[in-house]
Structures are given as structure tokens and as C-alpha cells.
């Protein structure tokens, strides 16, 4: 086991703060409509240019192990915020840096770190309650477009295309992002269904770039039991092979000999097949298989309907124009089912929704309606170069997450204004002791920081702007894009409530851990020997070769 270096108290925290500052300073230059670009080196190919905070954070690894631990903890703030809300990564990083920086001053002054953390937690709870009170539902296409534009770094084209996609497939529909073939962004809407089951073996993958199995014009076999014996499957496999088309098998499970045979046939190119487990459990699984059957124009092969696998024929199989199977989900695009049958099924499910008593059942039934009636929208991102394409695609994906978050929890005034307004409620809070009061003050100070950073990146004076915004009321704030003051909602500067809430929660959580850190342990760097020939110490004693009687 390698030797370890251990650091305690202030010296440990100082190194950790050093790492936090390096990462946060690199990330926060991207904040706001006038945020700057960061260029990331790639081990092969050209560099990547980005304004996405989490992409910058993920690239940073520091040589000093103690500083790196601090950087990695803040990286976790950005990643977690991105995973949950899809945006707000830079805001979360700025908040975490501010809470740690202010908190460390109080810890150095001898305050109790645990009480500081309790004060921070109290302030965060009060702020979130206030944000939810300010929040208003995001319902119109215009509002969705505004949220998308801001998340995509003030790119109104991206905001509009996402709003159009949501309008066409519904807020519950599936929206995917792909590389386009032209310079302009395009929107394709295809009827389709997605469910959360992926391929049963990675050997089914035929598209290495996307790590997906893509089937063009396939048949769909639906079976409600487990398939282990290949003999049951052979008759239908032979019929599909003769037809010369790929096959998707959806069953309770496919394993053993049956799965092995399908994989071998796929690898050899005899028959392109993919096997996936049926979605859901119990009665819900049966209902979802029936949904897929109606969508694809097939029949579920089940004993209840008097059908068996060995007697199945091609007309029992469903069909689709295209099916994409990833590790964790399957998307059926353009199923061959009759529109009237699909409509009747949707009506039937809507009646069940009205009759359902539990919220869980209602939610699951609504999901099924969305999958049958929603469809799939594909946003094709256009760009002049590959570097621009990657950067733009990342922004579209961020904006898509942000708009979903806005629809889910509503919107608040953007540009850091919501946090400034929430300070009034937090300022009235009182802790159980002086140290907890200091923790509340730490969060109060941090809540100004996103606005300060947006203003600094726009080239204006942060203190002047913060003072003017604080003296205003309601949605009054500073639009860094135009340099004007006014009602942020009317100017279209909006943030999803979920993004602001998640950023603050994650920042406070990790910052609280850092403030209460007293010891850090890291591996000692090994001293590598200098270059050159290795030591040949074992070659001595060869001087007596003269007496060898040559």
C-alpha cells in the first residue's frame, strides 16, 4: 500500500480552497449572455470551444492532490446540477465558491463549523420556499422559447426550435438532438414511442458512434413470456430471414440458448435482430405490450389469446419504419398501426385516467397516452464546422433540459434577480446562536454573487448594478444582454425555478461539507528515478577471466 500524506486544519482547507478557486474561476467566465468562451485542449483533433460550465468543469484535473480534491468536489456540484436540472451549472459553481470563501473566513476566526453549516442549511430552506412563492407556471410557447434562448446563451433560434418541438409533440413527448446536414437548425417531427428498456446484449449494437442498435423497416415480435429455448423461435426467425428484414423481439426476457443464437446470427450478418425486455411489470406490462402492438399493427403472442410462439406467422408481427435501441431505452418511430386503432386506444386510456384513484396510476396512464399520441421530435443542429457543431449541440441539449425544468416547476425572473429578491426573507431569519447567524449571512452574501458575475462578464460595475437592483421591487433587474434595467419577465429574461433551486441546494450541500472538513488524506507522489541506464550492480566479480585457458 502506497504511503499517504495527511493534512489537518487550516493547511488542509487552504489547499482545498486553492483547487476550488482554480475550477470556479475557469467556469464562471462563461456566466451570463456576455460570458466568454473557454478553449479546451483535446488529446486528438482540434480544440473544443465552449460556453458550457459543466464541460469546462469536467476537463479540470490539478497536479496538487489536495487542491484537486477541492476542485473535484465543486465539479460534483456542477455535474449534479446538470444531471437534475440540465442547466445552472455555472450558477451552482459560483454559489459554492462564494459560500466556501466566506465560510472559511469565519472558520479561521474560530467559529464552530457545524453551527455555520446549520445556519447555511436554514438559509437555503428559507430561500427555496421564497423561490417557490415567486414561481409562476410556464405555459405559453413564447415563455418556453425565452427559457430555451437564455439557457442556450441567448441564442433565440435554439429557444424557438425547442418551443416548436414541445408544441408539436406535447410537453410529455420525446425530443432528441442529432447532428444536422446543413448550416441551419432543423426540426423533424416523427410519430413514435419510447420506453425505458434497452438491448439485452451489447453485441446487438450496429452504430458505434451512438452506441445504439438501429433497425430500418423492421418486424416487431411481441411475446408476454420468457424465451430461453431457440426451437420455439426458429419458425418465425426463418420467415423473417426469408423476408430479408431486421427483427425486434420484445419479451418478458430472452436468455440462455435463445439469446446466444440471436447474437451469433447478428454478428455473422445472417439475421439482424435485437432483443429487449418488455417495459413495466405485471398487468402494466401486458397493457404496454398491447399499446406497442396497436402502434405497430401487430399482435401480442400470448396463451390467453390462443397464440403460441412456434405457430406465429409474419402477419402476427408488428412493423415500423425505424427503431433505435440504446442501452437504456428503445424508440419505435413511425409504427405501421392504423390511426383509428391508436386513437381508440388513447380514448380508452383517458377513460381509465378519469377513473383512477391513485396518483401513481394516473401518472403511469398519462405516460402511456404521451407515448402513444406524443410522437418523437428530432432537432437537427446545423453548423459550419465540427467544433461548432459539438458546442452548439451541447447548448441545445442544455436548453432542452432547462425548458423541461421550467414546464415542471415554473419560472422566476432571470439574471440573478430571483435570488436577490429572496434575500429579504432570508435576512429576517435568526439562528439559535451567533455562529448560526454567521452561516445565514454567508448565504445572503452568496446570493448576490451570480448577478455580480453576470455584470462583471458584461463589462459593467457589479456593486453599482447590485445596489440598483436591490432597491427595485418585483421582477426589476438588469438585462446584461442590452445593458438596460426593467421588468425581467417582460424582457424575456427567465430562469426555471428548478434550475435556481437545484443550483443553490447542491452548492450549499458541498460547501457545507468543505467547511466542516478538518483532515485530508492523499497518496504521496512517488519519486521516480532519473532517466538513463538502470543500475547494473550485479555484474561485479568478472575480473578473473584471464585464467580461462583460452
Curated annotation (Swiss-Prot):
Signal peptide: none annotated. Keywords: ATP-binding, Chaperone, Cytoplasm, Isomerase, Nucleotide-binding. It catalyses: ATP + H2O + a folded polypeptide = ADP + phosphate + an unfolded polypeptide. Its main location: cytoplasm. PROSITE patterns: CHAPERONINS_CPN60 (PS00296). The keyword Metal-binding does not apply. One of its GO terms (molecular function) is unfolded protein binding. SUPFAM superfamilies: GroEL apical domain-like (SSF52029), GroEL equatorial domain-like (SSF48592), GroEL-intermediate domain like (SSF54849). It is an enzyme of class 5 (isomerase). One of its GO terms (cellular component) is cytoplasm. It is found in: Cytoplasm. The keyword Cytoplasm applies. It holds the Pfam family Cpn60_TCP1. Forms a cylinder of 14 subunits composed of two heptameric rings stacked back-to-back. Interacts with the co-chaperonin GroES. Together with its co-chaperonin GroES, plays an essential role in assisting protein folding. The GroEL-GroES system forms a nano-cage that allows encapsulation of the non-native substrate proteins and provides a physical environment optimized to promote and accelerate protein folding. NCBIfam families: GroEL, PRK00013.1, PRK12849.1, PRK12850.1, PRK12851.1. Belongs to the chaperonin (HSP60) family. This is Chaperonin GroEL. It comes from Dechloromonas aromatica (strain RCB). The lineage of its organism: Bacteria, Pseudomonadati, Pseudomonadota, Betaproteobacteria, Rhodocyclales.
Amino acid at each position: 500500500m502506497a504511503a499517504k500524506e495527511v493534512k489537518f486544519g487550516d493547511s488542509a482547507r487552504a489547499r482545498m480552497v486553492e483547487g476550488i478557486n482554480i475550477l470556479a474561476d475557469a467556469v464562471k467566465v462563461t456566466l451570463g449572455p456576455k460570458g466568454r468562451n473557454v478553449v479546451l485542449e483535446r488529446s486528438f483533433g482540434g480544440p473544443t470551444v465552449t460556453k458550457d460550465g459543466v464541460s469546462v468543469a469536467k476537463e479540470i484535473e490539478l497536479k496538487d492532490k489536495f487542491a484537486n480534491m477541492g476542485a473535484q468536489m465543486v465539479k460534483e456540484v456542477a455535474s449534479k446540477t446538470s444531471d437534475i436540472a440540465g442547466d445552472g451549472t455555472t450558477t451552482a459553481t459560483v454559489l459554492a465558491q462564494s459560500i466556501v470563501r466566506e465560510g472559511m473566513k469565519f472558520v479561521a476566526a474560530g467559529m464552530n463549523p457545524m453551527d455555520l453549516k446549520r445556519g447555511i442549511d436554514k438559509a437555503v430552506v428559507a430561500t427555496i420556499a421564497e423561490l417557490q412563492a415567486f414561481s409562476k407556471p410556464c405555459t405559453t410557447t413564447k415563455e418556453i422559447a425565452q427559457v430555451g434562448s437564455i439557457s442556450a446563451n441567448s441564442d433565440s433560434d435554439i429557444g424557438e426550435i425547442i418551443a416548436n418541438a414541445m408544441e408539436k409533440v406535447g410537453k410529455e413527448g420525446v425530443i432528441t438532438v442529432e447532428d444536422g446536414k446543413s448550416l441551419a437548425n432543423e426540426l423533424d417531427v416523427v410519430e413514435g414511442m419510447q420506453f425505458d428498456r434497452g438491448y439485452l446484449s451489447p453485441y446487438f449494437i450496429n452504430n458505434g458512434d451512438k452506441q445504439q442498435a438501429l433497425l430500418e423497416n423492421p418486424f416487431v415480435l411481441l411475446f408476454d413470456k420468457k424465451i430461453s429455448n431457440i426451437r420455439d423461435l426458429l419458425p418465425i426467425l426463418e420467415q423473417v430471414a426469408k423476408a430479408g428484414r431486421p427483427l425486434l423481439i420484445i419479451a418478458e426476457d430472452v436468455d440462455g440458448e435463445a439469446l446466444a443464437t440471436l447474437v451469433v446470427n447478428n454478428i455473422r450478418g445472417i439475421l439482424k435482430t435485437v432483443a429487449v425486455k418488455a417495459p413495466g411489470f405485471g398487468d402494466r406490462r401486458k397493457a404496454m405490450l398491447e399499446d406497442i402492438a396497436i402502434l405497430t399493427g401487430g399482435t401480442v403472442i400470448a396463451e390467453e389469446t390462443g397464440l403460441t410462439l412456434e405457430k406465429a406467422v409474419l402477419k402476427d408481427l408488428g412493423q415500423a419504419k425505424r427503431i433505435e435501441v440504446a442501452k437504456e431505452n428503445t424508440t419505435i418511430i413511425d409504427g405501421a398501426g392504423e390511426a383509428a386503432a391508436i386513437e381508440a386506444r388513447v380514448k380508452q386510456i383517458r377513460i381509465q385516467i378519469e377513473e383512477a384513484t391513485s396518483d401513481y396510476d394516473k401518472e403511469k396512464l398519462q405516460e402511456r397516452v404521451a407515448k402513444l399520441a406524443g410522437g418523437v421530435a428530432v432537432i437537427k443542429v446545423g453548423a459550419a464546422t465540427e467544433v461548432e457543431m459539438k458546442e452548439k449541440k451541447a447548448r441545445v441539449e442544455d436548453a432542452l433540459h432547462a425548458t423541461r425544468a421550467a414546464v415542471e416547476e415554473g419560472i422566476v425572473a432571470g439574471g440573478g434577480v430571483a435570488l436577490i429578491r429572496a434575500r429579504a426573507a432570508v435576512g429576517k431569519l435568526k439562528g439559535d446562536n451567533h455562529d448560526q447567524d454567521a452561516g445565514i449571512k454567508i448565504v445572503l452574501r452568496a446570493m448576490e454573487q451570480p448577478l455580480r458575475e453576470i455584470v462583471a462578464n458584461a463589462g459593467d460595475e457589479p456593486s453599482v448594478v447590485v445596489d440598483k437592483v436591490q432597491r427595485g421591487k418585483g421582477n426589476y433587474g438588469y438585462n446584461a444582454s442590452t445593458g438596460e434595467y426593467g421588468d425581467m419577465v417582460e424582457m424575456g429574461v427567465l430562469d426555471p425555478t428548478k434550475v435556481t433551486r437545484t443550483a443553490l441546494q447542491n452548492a450549499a450541500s458541498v460547501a457545507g461539507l468543505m467547511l466542516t472538513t478538518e483532515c485530508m488524506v492523499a497518496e504521496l507522489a512517488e519519486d521516480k528515478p532519473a532517466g538513463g541506464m538502470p543500475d547494473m550492480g550485479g555484474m561485479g566479480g568478472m575480473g578473473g577471466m584471464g585464467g580461462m585457458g583460452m
